[in-house]
A protein has these predicted regions:
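Short helix- or helix-capping micro-motifs
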Residues: 215
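Extracytoplasmic/secreted envelope proteins and their assembly/folding machinery
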Residues: 68-72, 98, 113-116, 166, ...
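A conserved hydrophobic position in a structured secondary element of the catalytic/binding core
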Residues: 111, 207, 241, 248, ...
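Short, glycine-/small- and polar/acidic-enriched structural segments
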Residues: 26, 43-179, 184-187, 203-210, ...
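Short, Lys/Arg-enriched N-terminal segments with co-localized hydrophobic residues
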Residues: 3-20
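N-terminal Sec-pathway targeting helices
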Residues: 20-33
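Periplasmic-binding protein-like
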Residues: 131-141, 221-249, 253, 257-260, ...
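Secondary-structure end/capping motifs
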Residues: 247-305
Length: 305
């Protein structure tokens, strides 16, 4: 029997009861992105680099948040004689990062799945290689909000309309018999959300960690809804390559993907390393990082059909 559901199985899509959303989302990614692991691309070395170091360098874009931790770990675990050299390129917003990926300024990126799908729909050649993580999202409200109904007529922030965080809000509202017409959904940069909540500009927000834990640390918000109850093993990020880079350096793209997946396994097996690497790449205090890492997973990041 098919029905529309938001609980456990899927983010408000028509699915069969009991289907696992993670697998469904894998198939969406595979169908739209052209997953590197399942496609035999031709290998053509146009614009071949001049040095051995350049030959094995992959420029990877990221935002400094826990969701990019596998990228950081890949860099930390690389060796001088390894098959891949990682050059990390930091950006301050998703639009900047996507512009760099789409135009080939970087070779790959840790990016919101929905933004990659949108790029494909616009005819831009980007290709997914792996998941970024599972979970790691949080819904925060001010202390006066005690039910979804309390959000009627109030402003609620999301990082982007094309995001898992928006899907989670849609599910939350639908479960309560509400819709976007009942709540003012606003786009806002995640770093601005905790402060906006504290001054009453917004009543709550759905976001990737650590920006929920920041509000908890400030004492201005509370956890309102466990996203896992809305969408089990929800995902929002993926490792995505620029398509031209894959065509011209296919073996290198595959080598980096393997190193990335190995890094995810390492993180899953070494929780202490998660904190150490996070502290190096993210400017948050230890309690915020520790709280953030409790709700994010890095096990089994491979995309499989």
């Amino acid at each position: 029997m098919r029905e529309k559901t938001c609980v456990k199985n899927a983010p408000c899509y028509e699915v069969e009861r009991g289907e696992v959303m993670k697998k469904t989302w894998y198939l969406i990614i595979a169908a739209v992105f052209l997953v590197i692991g399942g496609i035999a691309y031709g290998y053509h070395e146009h614009n071949k680099p001049k040095t051995a170091q350049e030959l094995k360098t992959v420029r990877v874009a990221y935002l400094p948040i826990p969701h990019a931790l596998p990228v950081f770990a890949t860099k930390e675990l690389e060796t001088a004689d390894g098959p891949v050299h990682v050059e990390l390129v930091k950006y301050g917003s998703w639009p900047e990062l996507m512009d760099a990926l789409n135009t080939g300024k970087v070779d790959a990126a840790s990016v919101l799945v929905e933004l990659g799908v949108k790029a494909r729909e616009q005819g831009i050649d980007v290709r997914a290689a792996a998941l970024g993580h599972t979970e790691g999202n949080i819904i925060i409200v001010n202390k006066d909000i005690n039910s979804v109904q309390d959000l009627r007529g109030k402003s609620f922030a999301i990082p982007h309309k094309q995001s898992t965080q928006k899907v989670l809000v849609d599910c939350m509202l639908e479960q309560a018999g509400l819709s976007e017409k009942d709540v003012q959904i606003v786009e806002m940069s995640p770093p601005e959300m905790p402060s906006a909540l504290s001054v009453g500009q917004i009543a709550g927000y759905s976001v990737a960690e650590p920006f929920g834990s920041l509000a908890l640390e400030m004492g201005t918000g509370k956890v309102f809804e466990d996203p896992d109850h809305l969408w089990h093993d929800n995902i929002c990020c993926a490792l995505v390559f620029n398509g031209q880079f894959v065509d011209e350096h296919h073996d290198l793209a595959k080598a980096f993907t393997k190193a990335y997946l190995d890094a995810g396994t390492y993180l899953d097996e070494h929780p202490k390393a998660q904190e150490e690497i996070s502290s190096k790449y993210m400017k948050f205090n230890d309690p915020v990082i520790e709280r953030s890492l409790k709700v994010i997973g890095f096990k089994d990041l491979a995309l499989t059909e």
